[in-house]
Amino acid sequence: MEQWTTEIWFSISIAFLIGTLCGVLVMRFFKGNIQQQIQLKSELASAEAKIEEQKQQLERHFEQSANLLENLAEDYKKLYTHFAQNSEQLLPESNQVEFFKRLKNHANGDEDNQPRDYSDGSSGLLKS
C-alpha cells in the first residue's frame, strides 16, 4: 500500500468534521420529534396503566357484587326457611286451613266478575 500523504489525511479529517457537523445539525433539527415521541410513549404507558387499573377495579367490583348476591340469596333462603318452620309451629293446623281458605275465597270473588271497560255513570264532557 502506498504511503498516504498529509493532504490525504487532511482531506479525510475535513470530511470527518463535515460529517460530524452535519450529524449534529440533523440531530438538532429532529430533536423535537424525538422528544415528542418520548412524550407520546410516556402518555401511552400512563394511559395503558390507567386502563389496566380500571379493568382490575371492574373485576373487583363484579367479584364483590357476586359475593354479595350470593350472601343475599343465602340470607333470603334462611329467612324463608325460618318463616316456614315457625308458621308450621305457631299456627295450629285448623287455623292454617281457615286462613288459606279465606285467601282462596277472596281471590275467587274477584274472578267471578269480569272487568268492565266503562263506568256506571256518565263522565267527561257529556255528563247529564
From Swiss-Prot:
It is a single-pass membrane protein. Its main location: membrane. Residues 37-75 form a coiled coil. The keyword Membrane applies. The chain crosses the membrane at residues 7-27. Residues 105-128 are annotated as: Disordered. It is found in: Cell inner membrane. One of its GO terms (biological process) is regulation of cell shape. The keyword Cell inner membrane applies. Belongs to the ZapG family. Involved in cell division, cell envelope biogenesis and cell shape maintenance. The tetrameric alpha-helical coiled-coil structure is likely to be involved in linking the Z-ring to the septal peptidoglycan-synthesizing complexes. This is Z-ring associated protein G.
